[in-house]
Amino acid sequence: MGEIDIKSAGKIYPNGTRALEDVSITINDGEFVVLVGPSGCGKTTLLRMVAGLEDITEGEIAIGDKTVNEVAPKDRDIAMVFQNYALYPHMSVYDNMAFSLKLRKLPKDEIEQKVKDAAKTLEISELLERKPKALSGGQRQRVAMGRAIVRSPQAFLMDEPLSNLDAKLRVQMRAELGQLHTQLQTTTLYVTHDQVEAMTMGDRVAVIRKGELQQIDTPREIYSNPKNIFVAGFIGSPSMNFVYAKIKTENDVIELTFGDNQIRYKDQKKEKLKSFENKEIILGIRPEAFEDGYFANEADYSESIKVKVSLLEQLGSDSYVHFYKDIKPVQTEAIEEILADEGEDITVLGDSTKFIARINPNSTVAEGEEIELKINPSKLHFFDPVSGDVI
């Protein structure tokens, strides 16, 4: 069994800095779980604790049926794939892949069979005699994977293995890693900063912020039902739009007012929203909750707002409309952290709130034009302005 069980894990460095606090995750046998979060959130630290490269300050980590807190890395029966490939430059591809097997003093014919099988799986059989310097980035990554595969470990630990590749190759390698996992069915714990990687590759995704686990669930559930404002803003590209909205109940219908805009809401969460009567909440609207009024299905997109297009991005398959509303932007620690991670500064907005809407690519809207955008109320999200938790 390759199950990884992390129970209340914590990490405090000798200088008193806390990197992780009370993290509990179970990666089931054969499951692919992705740790995702901003730089410095503790995801790599957690991976290194599982690998045995970092001491566990608090809690317990088990691999298979064995607690490994005091077990040396070499005895944990795991294989790690690093961001920089960590190949020996003076060795051939074959020798790089065979190195750990030779250390274990396996018979020569068994080593040869394992290396050839892994090379065939990764489609690098013709590269076995080459040195790493003669390989492309994608080929080096396959060799690094092959070196892990030949060990037949209980689990793979992968630390941002695709981050050094260019965008096109990253997409290709994402698909190949997914297919490889389907073939091998080896328990995998994967760390990435890229939420697109996390969503496309993971059976489940664990979102970490400031050393604490925010939510772990399937990609669909993480996206559709985020537990707090940080998860909602961090997952999704472009990010969710946030705006302060005032709640008012009228004839059993919730009215959400932001600036001079009103949205009527009568979906399943209305009872919870009633407790915020005449108070402000944080309203979350994903870009796809908008549509050009001309193309919108009235049954779904029942509400509308008038906007002036400040920027139009036409990507072929989608178009993105950027617009502003004269409303003070939502300023919470979580949102500022997300913007900082994206390289943006909330202070440049002043008293305006920026929105991005995804609309039908056949729309004829133009920059500077005033248009009607329809909104699907069933796709709205609501957050407590104090705690940041979902309402």
Enumerate the language-model features and the residues they cover:
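ABC ATPase nucleotide-binding domains
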Residues: 73-234
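The feature captures the beta-strand-to-loop junction immediately N-terminal to the Walker
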Residues: 36-38
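Short coil-to-beta microelement around the adenine-binding A-loop and adjacent beta1/P-loop entry
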Residues: 16-18
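ABC ATPase nucleotide-binding domain
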Residues: 5, 26, 62, 372-374
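ATP-binding/catalytic-site motifs of ATP-hydrolyzing domains
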Residues: 60-62, 66, 212
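Non-catalytic connector elements of ABC transporters
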Residues: 250-391
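Helix-to-loop junction immediately C-terminal to a conserved catalytic motif
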Residues: 51
